Design a protein with these regions (language model features):
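Short, glycine-/aromatic-enriched active-site segment of Class I SAM-dependent methyltransferases
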Residues: 212-239, 244-249
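A short glycine-rich, Lys/Arg-flanked "PGG" loop and its adjoining helix->strand segment in the class I
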Residues: 194-209
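Conserved N-terminal segment of class I S-adenosyl-L-methionine
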Residues: 2-184, 194-197, 262-263, 308-317, ...
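A short His-aromatic
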Residues: 185-189
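Rossmann-like AdoMet/SAM-dependent catalytic core
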Residues: 21, 259, 277-318, 326
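Conserved catalytic loop of SAM-dependent methyltransferase domains
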Residues: 38-43, 258-286
Length: 326
């Protein structure tokens, strides 16, 4: 009896993992769909769906992109532009001030750390700027891309490591080497944020400090803009962690929470990014450049007020690792 040829897998199946039925943070099956982000291009496989756990409020991409899916979107010009949209929304001077403010968070607790690892450092712009405050600190960079090697050649870091912090060989090389570890919008992209936190604490010396900055899932723009909110449209953003969950996890691992901040990390880009995403598939997107510029001006004009409200789109945590294992 003739058999029909096997059905070839859909492109979306190749680029997306099976949908999960429980929360990756607490394990609850009580989920709801929080947002459906529109495809950025007509040829894009599937859409980004963000689910939220009703129990712990952890939000996550579901189904999650596979390694092939991440690679596909990484090669896409528009998706790549979204990944660093927030950084590009700032002038060079404003971006430098922002990096200095983040580095200054550490000053009250450790005026002269010997060694500092910036995880997900990219081109190492943060270490380059932080050296102005910590001229005697040795800054190293870790990134999954060769960008960090270019940063080494341009002397923005003293050591460049390519890979993921959870890679056993990376962890073995860096264990207990650092006084400070920083992660700026890195945990959102980690497949397993808990494993990433464990690895970060492993490379810290006892009493070392962990500086983390993340998109804030409680931001009111998330509800107002829906699928056009920038974090929902970024292919590599896999998780949105509530501050309370992250603080609780750090405390469970014996850390002391020193400071939390929802004001300073706010980046004025929500309206302009939403308009950019909304017009991504429109033939009028180039003609809309003046409209996007106006939205960007409005983002910046409202920023001093919005950063004091639920419209703030990011938060920052500084934690201290226990002197002795918990």
């Amino acid at each position: 009896m003739p058999t029909s040829p096997p059905t070839p897998p859909r492109v979306a199946d190749l680029f997306q993992e099976p949908r999960r039925e429980n929360c990756p943070w607490c394990g609850s099956g009580n989920l709801r769909t929080r947002a459906r982000a529109a495809a950025l291009r007509p040829r894009d496989p599937g859409r980004f769906v963000v689910d939220e756990c009703r129990e712990c409020r952890h939000a996550f991409q579901n189904p999650r992109l596979t390694a092939e899916g991440l690679a596909f979107h990484q090669l896409d010009f528009f998706a790549g532009r979204l990944e660093d949209f927030a950084e590009r929304s700032l002038t060079a001077r404003a971006a430098r001030r922002r990096r200095l403010a983040a580095a200054r968070t550490v000053l009250p607790v450790t005026a002269e750390p010997e060694s500092w690892l910036d995880v997900g450092t990219g081109h190492a712009r943060f270490p380059e700027t932080a050296k102005e405050l910590f001229p005697y600190t040795s800054f190293d960079g870790l990134d999954p891309t060769p960008r960090v090697e270019q940063a080494l050649r341009e002397e923005r870091v003293e050591e460049a490591h390519i890979g993921d912090l959870t890679d056993p060989w990376v962890l073995a090389r860096l264990r207990s080497r650092y006084d400070v570890v920083s992660m700026f919008h890195h945990l959102e992209q980690a497949p397993n944020p808990r494993a990433e936190l464990r690895a970060a604490l492993a490379v810290l010396r006892p009493g070392g400090h962990l500086l983390i900055e993340l998109a804030d899932p409680r931001c009111a723009f998330a509800a107002l803009l829906g699928g056009w909110w920038l974090p929902y449209g970024r292919p590599r953003l896999l998780h949105l962690l509530p501050m309370a969950n992250l603080c609780a996890e750090l405390k469970t691992r014996g850390c002391e929470i020193l400071t939390t901040d929802r004001r300073a990390p706010h980046t004025p880009c929500d309206l302009s990014a939403a308009l950019t995403i909304a017009l991504a598939r429109s033939p009028l997107r180039k003609a809309a450049a003046p409209l996007i510029a106006t939205a960007s001006a409005l983002d910046h004009a409202l920023a001093p007020l919005l950063r004091r409200t639920r419209f703030s789109n990011a938060y920052r945590i500084l934690a201290r690792k226990a002197e002795q294992p918990a």
